[in-house]
Amino acid sequence: MSGQRKGYIAKVSGPVVIAKGISDIKMGEVVYVGNEGLLGEVVRVSQDSFAVQVYEDTSGLRPKEPVTATGKLLVAELGPGLMGRVFDGVQRPLKSIEELVGPFVKRGVKVNPLPRNVKWHFKPSVKVGDKVSSGDIIGVVQETPLIEHRVMVPIGVSGKVKEVVPEGDYTVEDPVVILESDGRVVELTMKQEWPVRQPRPYKERLPSEVPLLIGQRIIDTFFPIAKGGAGAIPGGFGTGKTVTLHKVSMYSDSQIVVYIGCGERGNEIAEMLKEFPVLVDPKSGRPIIERSIIIANTSNMPVSAREASIYMGVTIAEYYRDQGYDVTLIADSTSRWAEALREIAGRLGELPVERGYPAYLPDKIAEFYERGGRVKALGSPERSGSVTVLGAVSPPGGDYNEPVTIHTLRFVGTMWALDTDLAYRRHFPAINWLKSFSQYADIIERWWVKNVSPEFPKYRRRALRLLTVASEIEAIASVVGEGALPDDQRLILLTSEIIKEGFLRQTALSGEDVFCKPEKQYWLLKMMMDFFDKSYELIRKRVSIEEILRMPEIYEMMRVKEDERGLQAVKELYERVMAKLDEIAQRHGVTLAVEAEEVVA
């Protein structure tokens, strides 16, 4: 069929090709363009012509070269062999391309996404006579030491099991189960295909109630994201977006990470590929690459493939979600994707709106973030999975009032606002605690109450309030000087400095502080807020703040996070700090009992 449906190029405009000669072409259909057969997708159909978005470099294409229709939509190939591999934006494995044509991706190169020659050990979980339908698990494959791949009945297929292969080694193309469906025989292999622009169906959407723990204190404690939630990380150049997202992919407690490098620098992807095979997953002791899939679409790759990479990544994430896994999908950066949309829209002559972006930009952004969520999957056995979507946004000049940032914030539940001033002060992660927000915080507090401490919500709220009050006092102190402030305000500034240095600031490179467990986060915050409460009561009882400032434990509170003894060191320091404050109180003959709720309620 594909040999018969041929047209020809009428016009080439950058990544957009106008073609003619195929009367029954459909929107979204995949076509091969030119003598080299460049992959493209139909994005507009007119009465006598159609526009193709080409996913490869169009240099050298000429009018009258052939355009061949395939009759298929742009699909992701799903099955064993995805995990631990690196793909380009249209799911071509880069390692296979290197073996085939060398270090540079040549135009028109065609490689199967899943290896056809690798045999996987398949264990069937159905027997002859069983009735199966969409989403039912028919067998399992140990894809990597960390991930068990659950082979599912493709969506839209059902029937009675007629034949099952015995446990053994098979390729992704070998039939493993044969069904009888409405008098037809259907062969099921370990691979299936799914159109990337169409969300995969599920049985039921579930509430997002469990936190995605990342080990970064400012995120887990103050601005958490739920499994199945959506988050944005806007920030200017050099504020640490990519490093923050790398930490999420390395240390988050999701079972699978899909990382989309969309239009970012090639060196950053190269750095990831160097780190991931070496870095060890703290929970399993295995390399992190064994639970990761990387889609590399760097800034020097074709612009139009950026859009395909976003949809390809989210489709793969949904596939593993349907198997019952918690997946984190990271898109770095969605701004580059939006720029690609802008360029394609301009080439097609669509009406530009704000800053040249097309009018449908908000719909595209919403479509992407709404594919996240925690769901009950189709089929049996019953299982639930989640896709947590995290997108970096790179506003030009750090301006949050540009369209991509504004529209993104409408559709996400968490924003980690990266601040240029904090980054220049070497305060990392440079997340601004006054601009960031999390709509999941109240729901996730229940998890902290149940698993860590019932007092956690109180400490969290009061610490955030103290930081807000401190920022107002800092503005006054910059005019009159800190020495001119009353003692209670000086104490607020001191505690705020302890929280910033000892809690919010965190190394991303090595040592004890690279990942902080929930219990340690709670005890650090408890120590700092209890220090504030007791010190505030001393000041109210006319004890000078100079007495408190002389405590050597103040500097220890800022450094204990790096102590290799971990939680034990924090608890020991807490006892010493409380004992020291009690000693000061005893010396001045005052009683300590009251929390400083009225100052930072």
Curated annotation (Swiss-Prot):
Topology relative to the membrane: Peripheral membrane protein
Cited InterPro entries: ATP-synt_VA_C (IPR055190), ATP-synth_a_Xtn (IPR031686), ATP_synth_asu-like_sf (IPR023366), ATPase_a/bsu_AS (IPR020003), ATPase_F1/V1/A1_a/bsu_N (IPR004100), ATPase_F1/V1/A1_a/bsu_N_sf (IPR036121), ATPase_F1/V1/A1_a/bsu_nucl-bd (IPR000194), ATPase_F1/V1_b/a_C (IPR024034)
Example of a GO cellular component annotation carried by this entry: plasma membrane
Binding, ATP: G235, G236, F237, G238, T239, G240, K241, T242
Statement: the UniProt record of this protein carries the keyword Nucleotide-binding: yes
Molecular functions per Gene Ontology: ATP binding; proton-transporting ATP synthase activity, rotational mechanism; proton-transporting ATPase activity, rotational mechanism
Cellular localisation: Cell membrane
Listed GO biological process terms: proton motive force-driven plasma membrane ATP synthesis
Keywords: ATP synthesis, ATP-binding, Cell membrane, Hydrogen ion transport, Ion transport, Membrane, Nucleotide-binding, Translocase, Transport
Reactions accelerated catalytically: ATP + H2O + 4 H(+)(in) = ADP + phosphate + 5 H(+)(out)
Presence of keyword ATP-binding: yes
E.C. number(s) listed in UniProt: 7.1.2.2
Pfam families on file: ATP-synt_ab, ATP-synt_ab_N, ATP-synt_ab_Xtn, ATP-synt_VA_C
Function per UniProt: Component of the A-type ATP synthase that produces ATP from ADP in the presence of a proton gradient across the membrane. The A chain is the catalytic subunit.
Recorded family membership: Belongs to the ATPase alpha/beta chains family.
PANTHER family xref list: H(+)-TRANSPORTING TWO-SECTOR ATPASE, V-TYPE PROTON ATPASE CATALYTIC SUBUNIT A
UniProt protein name: A-type ATP synthase subunit A
Source organism of the structure: Thermofilum pendens (strain DSM 2475 / Hrk 5)
Gene that this sequence comes from: atpA
